[in-house]
Amino acid sequence: MSGETPYFTGVTSHGQQGRTARRAKSWVKDWKNWLKVRAMQGLHLTADLQQCACDERWLLDAEALGQACAEAVRAAGLQAVGQLFHSFPASSHGPGGVTAVVLLAESHLCVHTWPEQQGVTLDVYVCNFGADHSARAHALMDALVALFQPARASHNELMRGYLN
């Protein structure tokens, strides 16, 4: 490597790009790409709950469900930054359900209830920018599943933001 200038300059005394500089540029490019991908990584948990044996208020009462969601978020160590809870009116199909959304500093929680079917769908997504919040996402999901007491549950886990 004689004739090359110090690391990262990329020019030899002969005016050609040296091997050390090419390797350094390649490393910097790889590092920048890794940071972009790492910044997008997150964990997306979903659950479909059936035959929920919980108190009926968790399926019907937006205010009660909202308080339970807020408490579960706090207990899991996540930070709520906004929330919206909506009750649907009763129809010929049965009582109206609830949609609960909690916007998290780490991402979001969504809950949708179908009281006429004793069913619930849950959606927890956490971005892992700056720290891995996966354990907290699992704790939040576990707390909500316990609240609804389903006889049957289907869980899914998806790692998000891994780009090639």
What are these regions (language model features)?
Residues 2-164:
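Polybasic/polar functional segments that serve as interface/processing modules
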